A protein has these predicted regions:
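Flexible, polar/acidic helix-loop-strand segments at domain edges
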Residues: 1, 9, 25-138
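Long, intrinsically disordered, low-complexity segments
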Residues: 1-26, 126-136, 167, 172-253
Length: 253
C-alpha cells in the first residue's frame, strides 16, 4: 500500500530546489512512488460538509500538509508545503505530491530493520511495503451495510442512526435521515474505508460502478462503458457448460 498510495516526494521541485528527502518514514509517505493518486472527489469533495470537524480528515489521517526537510528551502519559503496551496512549480495532484491517507504507511513507526538512519527516519531501499495490521472485517462496515439494508427498506431513520454511530466516533456532524441516499452511503464508505475496501466490488454489487466513475473519477470516465458493470465470463467456462447455453454478459464478445 505505501509504495502505491503515497506520493514520490523525491520528485517535488520548487524554486529550483527539492524541499524533501526521500525515502523518509514520516508523513511524507515513506518510500511511496505515487501510482494510486487520490481523486479530487476523494481528497476534497466528500469532506466539504465537515472538513475540519471530521477526525478522519485531520492532517495526520489525510495528509495535505507536508513538513519540509530541506532547511535552506524552509528558511526561504516556509517549513510546510500544502497540497491545497501548492508552491511555485508544483502541480497538485501529480505523482510527486497529492493528499493521501496515512494508514497506507506507518509514519515514524517502520520496522527497525528498514531504517538506514533511525534518528532521521531515513529508510533503506527495502522499504515500501505496509506494516500495519490489515482489517478483514470492520464493525464500521457492518453498520454501513445495515444502513444500506435499512435504506432499501425505506427506513431512513434507522439507516441514519447506524451511520451516525460511525460519525459520532469520528467527531463528525450527524447525518439527517432526509440526507441518507445510496450515494451518501457510498461517500461515507469512502470516508471510513478509504484504501481498505475493495471499492470496485462494492460498486458492482450495488450496480453503481458506471455512475460513480462518471461522477467521481474523470481519469477513468473517459473510457468508461456501461457494460463494465459486469465482468466478462471466461470463454473456457462457457465452453465447459454443456448442460445449457451460458450466454456471455452484454458488451463482450
Amino acid at each position: 500500500l505505501e509504495r502505491h498510495h503515497a506520493p514520490v516526494v523525491r520528485d517535488v521541485k520548487s524554486h529550483g530546489m527539492n524541499p524533501f528527502s526521500w525515502p523518509i518514514g514520516d508523513y511524507t509517505g515513506g518510500r511511496g512512488i505515487g501510482w494510486a493518486i487520490s481523486t479530487q472527489y476523494f481528497s476534497d469533495e466528500i469532506w466539504k460538509d465537515d472538513f475540519y470537524g471530521d477526525m478522519r480528515n485531520a492532517n495526520h489521517n489525510f495528509v495535505r500538509k507536508f513538513a519540509v526537510h530541506n532547511k535552506e528551502y524552509a528558511k526561504l519559503y516556509g517549513d510546510t508545503i500544502d497540497t491545497q496551496n501548492p508552491p511555485v512549480g508544483v502541480t497538485v495532484p501529480s505523482r510527486p505530491l497529492y493528499a493521501y491517507q496515512s494508514k497506507c504507511t506507518t509514519p515514524y513507526n517502520h520496522p527497525e530493520g528498514l531504517y538506514s538512519n533511525a534518528k532521521t527516519y531515513a529508510l533503506n531501499s527495502g522499504a515500501g511495503a505496509t506494516y500495519t495490521d490489515q482489517y478483514m472485517f470492520r464493525l464500521a462496515e457492518t453498520y454501513l451495510l445495515r444502513a444500506e439494508a435499512y435504506l432499501e427498506l425505506n427506513d431512513k431513520d434507522k439507516a441514519a442512526a447506524d451511520i451516525n454511530v460511525i460519525r459520532d466516533r469520528a467527531h463528525a456532524k450527524p447525518v439527517l435521515s432526509s440526507q441518507v441516499t445510496l450515494d451518501y452511503i457510498l461517500d461515507e464508505r469512502m470516508r471510513e474505508l478509504g484504501v481498505e475496501e475493495r471499492r470496485r466490488i462494492t460498486l458492482m454489487r450495488m450496480g453503481k460502478l458506471y455512475d460513480r466513475v462518471m461522477k467521481c473519477n474523470p481519469y477513468y470516465a473517459k473510457e468508461m462503458e456501461k457494460h463494465y458493470e459486469l465482468w466478462p465470463i471466461p470463454y473456457k467456462e462457457i465452453e465447459a457448460n454443456r448442460g445449457a447455453v451460458l450466454e456471455q454478459n452484454p458488451g463482450y464478445e
